[in-house]
Design a protein with these regions (language model features):
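STAS-like cytosolic regulatory interaction modules
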Residues: 26, 48-49, 84-196, 200-206
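The feature marks cytosolic C-terminal regulatory regions of anion transporters and related permeases
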Residues: 1-106, 110
Length: 207
């Protein structure tokens, strides 16, 4: 399960990062294997067992899911429907475009058409209604804003030391500036990623 670190971009394993906090009202689940009949039940149970009363969004980081079979595809659809009944939005993100093709071939194109498939975790969070910096459990909002201001000041400090590599690395380490960029735009590129060879047909349907 993933969360955020105050003042930093990107998403981090909650069990491996002491400073990581869950994003409010959100479950971000990374599944580190292809999804098929033998492990799809575990996948579903892991997510459902981690839900809280205030959970509003579930996001799957499917970056390592390269293949999926019909049983697993059915599980995804069942999970999505179960979550919808509870008022919880469901997203699949971070995977290669080929997985979208597999979903369509298995008759699960509705997941794409209904917006459940997004290119990045950040895009899913923004689509769910959250804004950056994303609110973290147990972290006051004003602290997040203060850290943002601190980063801006740090960037000025970095520019004044641009010829001193040692000072730059020291400032970065002190102020947590090892940030990871995250894509967030809802663009034609993402649309093409989602629909693959069917992109033109899908665009024509919407014109």
């Amino acid at each position: 399960f993933l969360g955020g670190i105050p003042g930093r971009d990107g998403f981090y394993d909650l069990n491996k990062n002491h400073y990581a906090h869950p994003i409010e009202n959100t479950v971000i689940y990374r599944f580190n294997a292809s999804l098929f009949f033998a492990n799809s039940k575990l996948f579903q149970e892991d997510i459902e067992n981690h839900l809280k009363e205030d959970t509003k969004t579930v996001i799957v980081d499917a970056g390592t899911i390269t293949n999926i079979d019909i049983t697993a595809a059915d599980t995804l659809l069942m999970l999505k429907n179960n979550l919808e009944k509870k008022g919880i939005a469901f997203y699949i993100t971070e995977h290669m475009q080929g997985l979208n093709t597999q979903l369509r071939n298995l008759g699960m194109g509705s997941l794409i058409e209904e917006g459940c498939v997004r290119r990045t975790i950040t895009a899913a969070l923004l689509d769910s209604g959250l804004q950056k910096p994303f609110p973290l459990e147990g972290v006051p909002a004003d602290l997040q804003e203060n850290l943002k201001e601190l980063q801006e000041n740090a960037e000025k400090a970095l520019s004044s030391h641009k010829h001193n590599t040692k000072n730059i690395e020291k400032i970065k380490k002190t102020l947590w500036l090892h940030t990871l960029p995250a894509e967030e735009e809802n663009t034609l590129e993402e649309f093409a990623w989602a629909f693959g060879e069917d992109t033109v047909n899908e665009i024509e349907k919407r014109v």
